[in-house]
Amino acid sequence: MYRTKVGLKDRQQLYKLIISQLLYDGYISIANGLINEIKPQSVCAPSEQLLHLIKLGMENDDTAVQYAIGRSDTVAPGTGIDLEFDADVQTMSPEASEYETCYVTSHKGPCRVATYSRDGQLIATGSADASIKILDTERMLAKSAMPIEVMMNETAQQNMENHPVIRTLYDHVDEVTCLAFHPTEQILASGSRDYTLKLFDYSKPSAKRAFKYIQEAEMLRSISFHPSGDFILVGTQHPTLRLYDINTFQCFVSCNPQDQHADAICSVNYNSSANMYVTGSKDGCIKLWDGVSNRCITTFEKAHDGAEVCSAIFSKNSKYILSSGKDSVAKLWEISTGRTLVRYTGAGLSGRQVHRTQAVFNHTEDYVLLPDERTISLCCWDSRIAERRNLLSLGHNNIVRCIVHSPTNPGFMTCSDDFRARFWYRRSTTD
């Protein structure tokens, strides 16, 4: 949403409206005090024009509509944190400690990556065993709510029809390291230690192999689709960021070598409007890029005091970047100024993390979540004031390597070196 520039005359008009409203409501002494302080150029008559303007603005302001949606259990993309206007927000969404495990799926090796589809209906998990699973969130919830006697009496056909794992994909020959759903098509992209990016058409139940692939020169570490679905960003063990045309597989890189990182790229993510993307690297820097020119706009040097940057994502309104590093700290950055506005600390009290994981928002961006590697628990903070909430024990038998939160619902997936992926959900009282 674009805002017009506010000038001195606009403020003078605002003060006159405030005085008129105060006079209309009978607060004469307060109005006179304001008149003596501001000294308006013309007489202010009692009026409730300000009240009508506010009511009209609230009825027609898309932001107000989105705000109302954003405080429910299910949200649409576009709502979220905005520190310019969120001073008095009452958090309504559930904190992490209120979630419970609803389903567990197992791989034959460490599970280290997961991703949600844009509508929050599907989750893909990837493993060191080179396999990929696609799970249906509604089926996982239904399975967890099913009485044990009903589950035991299911026929093989019923079990297959109701099974949460709707696809299992095999086409990599080494660990699956990154995953991304296409924004509009039934296509899943995956990257691997086998140096390939593969595209799977999961609309076909029988399809287990990729229909397209890109051969890279290094291990893939992070991928992100352009919101149109026509391009995909690829971060690898090499410091040079790649952008591929999905249809032609033509590769684009910045024309200025100085734009690039100095070490492996750990995280790449587009914002919702595709006019920017952000990268984080083992070199300790976060870079903000122009989504059209493919040039680096800003570099946040030593974003985590020199520690490796593990993740960097945009808030839904693209005003902020949420990052995490191997210093076990999450930070909220204001893009317009490059400042750290909020620091979320306490996840590494028993020692800094060794392995890469992510800081994520919940679906309403009321909370920031970050796994604590040593205690195998989930830290949760109020995203606006960094107040720590109750820890959630994640129930894994080994370190948690990945967390992804639903973009639309109170659910998230954790992936661990214990070979398992756990689906967590906060059921409402009506479920």
From Swiss-Prot:
Taken from the UniProt entry, a GO cellular component term is:
mRNA cleavage stimulating factor complex
Q: What main location does UniProt list?
A: nucleus
| WD repeat positions | 106-145, 171-210, 215-254, 260-301, 303-343, 395-431
**Which UniProt key words apply to this protein?**
mRNA processing, Nucleus, Repeat, WD repeat
What disulfide bonds does the UniProt entry report for this chain? none
UniProt keyword annotation of Repeat present: yes
**GO biological process entries:** mRNA 3'-end processing
Q: Which GO terms describe its molecular function?
A: RNA binding
Determine if Transcription is one of this entry's keywords: no
| PROSITE patterns in UniProt | WD_REPEATS_1, WD_REPEATS_2, WD_REPEATS_REGION
What domain notes does the record hold?
N-terminus mediates homodimerization.
Under the subunit heading, UniProt states: Homodimer. The CSTF complex is composed of CSTF1 (50 kDa subunit), CSTF2 (64 kDa subunit) and CSTF3 (77 kDa subunit). Interacts (via repeats WD) directly with CSTF3. Interacts (via repeat WD6) with BARD1. Interacts with ERCC6.
> What is this protein's function per UniProt?
One of the multiple factors required for polyadenylation and 3'-end cleavage of mammalian pre-mRNAs. May be responsible for the interaction of CSTF with other factors to form a stable complex on the pre-mRNA.
Recorded protein name is: Cleavage stimulation factor subunit 1
